[in-house]
Amino acid sequence: MRALRLHAPAPVETRPLVLENVPDLTPGPGQILVKVSACGICRTDLHVVEGELPVVRPLVIPGHQVAGTVVGAGTGAEALLGRRVGIGWLHRTCGSCRFCVGGRENLCDAPEFTGWTVDGGFATSILADADFVYELPDGFSDVVAAPLLCAGIIGYRALRLTGLAGRPSGFRGARLGLYGFGAAGHIAIQIARARGADVYVMTRDRERHQALAEELGAAWVGGARDIPPSKLDAAIIFAPAGELIPAGLAALDKGGTLVLGGIHMSDSPPIPYELLYQERVVRSVANNTRNDGREFLAEAARIPVTTHVRTFGLEEANDALIALKTDAIRGAGVLVVA
């Protein structure tokens, strides 16, 4: 099989991912072997490649938004043979810690993550735990489905953590802010608008991100540091920029919630207490549960969500990550593998 391996973390401009021939994979008990068709690129992949997330697995193969077909199965996983499946960030959890037992497996004490602690989908094949994959809805091709498997699922969980669903009217009529409008943002706006929210988008790049936000029905679009015209009931920061936290808090109405949607984010500057006062809340998103993924994919199929993608070949992965780093991708980037 062919795979892109990271020999040592380095700026992506130095092209640290190397396409190599590596031994073929054999699934063990409870595992499946997936022929990769497409793999989305994510800012977390960039954090792995450039070393902002520490090296856990030497020569790791990145990639955690994988769509493909099951071509092999270990004992106990044979029922998935021939199925189209999606593989996300959460590779496996321990199942026995107090967080797993309590229904919060996203906070597992001993998790494994696709493309970071175990090999991911920047390859022609991948192994996955059969209990942690998703069956893909028929309405989505593999290329279109790939960004749903992290950007979509994390966006869905971030929307849940806003607490807007708990309002008497739910999302209907709520004012939601989105800071950053890449892969996750352009999916989250579709879910929020389908639920009836008015979405205010603060993001860079007029030609790409702001224009796409307008196409997808944002109530208002401005620059990353612009102040929205109305106080927000909740906001999500998808950009990995901690310096946006004070601005996000300042944009909230009383009792509002600011959700930090990234696995990695730069440090926040000091936050004046007056920005937190009147019961404003800041909370982070930590991974996702399998139920998040199942519920999101079902809702995405009902709406239906449309992913806007820019495709690259497997051998172009370094170029794809450079494009992601420089905000040159409108919507989501996807490696087409087969």
Predicted regions and their residues:
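C-terminal hydrophobic helical "lid"/dimerization subdomain
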Residues: M1-A3, R290-A338
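Glycine-rich beta-strand-centered segment in the early N-terminal region that forms part
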Residues: P23-C39, E52-R98, P137-G139
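NAD(P)H dinucleotide-binding glycine-rich loop of Rossmann-like/cofactor-binding domains
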Residues: T93-Y179
